[in-house]
Amino acid sequence: MKEAIPGAGLHTVLRSLVATLPTPDRWKVGIYVALSLASALAGALAAILLVPLVQPDARLPFEGRWFHASMSMGWRTTAFTGVTLAFALLRWQASCLGARLVGRYGMRLRRQVHARLIAAEIGPLAASSAEIANVLTYNVEIVVQGFSALQQLLVAGVTAMVSLSLAFWVSPPLLLVAPPLAVLALLASRFYGREQIEVGHRYVADMTRLFWHSEDFPRRLRHVRSFGREDVERGSYGEVSSDLARGYARQLELIASGRLILELLAVGGIALLFVLAQRWHGIDQGALIAVCLLLGRLLPYLVSTRQSVQQMRSAAPAFELWQRYMHLPTSHAPPAATARPAIPDAGIHLRRIHVAPPIPGIELGDLVLRPGELVLVQGDSGIGKSSLVDVLAGMARPVVFDACVGGHAIDYDAYRAYVHHGAYVSQSVRPWQATVRDCLRWAAPSGTDGQFREVLREVGLDKHLDTALHDASSRLSGGELQRLLLAQVILREPAVAVLDEATGALDAASELAVLSAMKRRLPRSLLIVVSHREGVGALADRCVTVGPAIRSIVPSHAGA
């Protein structure tokens, strides 16, 4: 797939949009164009058949055996009605097919970018959560509008080609006005093009800022209220909303301005057509009416074409953002289920690991990870604990990795195979399922209600399985949500469980009780716990301390 160039021209966006279509849908686009062509032919023919109904003495260019001047008005009306019905049915069929294509296109874009994010390396995603939310939601809508505009451009192009061809067939002299008008229309289509792209870029950026204001709103609201900054928050949100309003209004103004230019050109063209007909002797009145009807059919398409071009330009920055996330580096594919070895009792000996960032990095050496043990990772905030545990969880590749199992050296991909069946719970993650049962079944699809109740007792959560997680009357506290997520870990029975400050909402005694229960219930699991509380060291088999002065980590045996 080709990567879109920021600020690229309309032809580049068109090429990139088409490149995202799979082959079956390209064939369906071809069918859509064919239906549009048939619809345009039927519509143009209906316009010509209207002439003898308006002026009975007019002669049609295709008069012959099946249609001639001596036909009764009833037959002429029947022919016009039949062709008009065919036009309506063909246009309806094309519209239905186009709607299905647009729907599938949006679905595919969302699935593709979501799948790419699921497979992406953790590092590049750390500081862009609001932008990611935008990419997964509204941004795709803008791109889909661009794809729908592309369909409308195809219809307009086919209709214009058919109408102009038939008009030339009916009366070639009258079409002398077409070339200069076409040149003027082409020039008009370029008006405001650069500004439209700039407005589109700003609109996408402002929408991302709006997502920042909306992200995790309850926690944000507590923070704002505690600092007494409600007025500042309202002002900041209002500023973003105003920028969005101005951007949206400017987009509509640009569309309206372009439409006005095209309508003025159309009025001038029709007036010029009548002047030409009066001055050019020998032009049949019926031919003049037919040409006017054929060209009149193009007026709404001229207006919609301008709007479609503007929508395509607005979609360009949104499509560039989508493609930027589609080019994120991905982590290596997880090993097959049959290729996941169990961590041996002797453990995995990590002889040397270098993690960066943070700069200058973290150096870890001589640490053994054994099943059934609890490794405590401590250190000041922001010093790199999460970066280290990302590596230990197999989610982020280190700069240097030197390890062995049973005396045999392994690389990081082999290490990932050992720890792939894992569980990772961080402090900020919140369950998105509807009920307690749904949350537990997500972690253990084959689990029973009895198993779910038992594991809830183990973590000290006294809640019914049907308790709603997001209902105002039954919302769980922060500590209860953490207990629920830890229950997921027990049901998972992972090879490695990483708890990155996942017990911070519990008091010290509850934290020790829950961790003790997890260690008891998971005798074959390695627990890696990040915590600021010194008391957790009493449960730890090994402690890793990230020092504030030098970023060299020396694991020490707990209690040593």
Say what each PLM segment does:
Residues 32-38, 152-202, 272-286:
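Transmembrane helices of ABC transporter permease
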Residues 229, 253, 298-328, 334:
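Cytosolic ends of transmembrane helices, especially the final helix of ABC transmembrane type-1 domains
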Residues 118-162:
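Juxtamembrane loop-to-helix connectors within ABC transporter transmembrane domains
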Residues 19-26, 122, 138-146, 150, ...:
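An intracellular "coupling" helix at the cytosolic face of ABC transporter transmembrane type-1 domains
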Residues 429-471:
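Conserved "ABC signature" C-loop
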Residues 393:
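Helix-to-loop junction immediately C-terminal to a conserved catalytic motif
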Residues 1-46, 61-77, 94-98, 102, ...:
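Membrane-integrated ABC transporters
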Residues 80-91, 182-184, 259-262, 266, ...:
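Hydrophobic alpha-helical segments in the permease module
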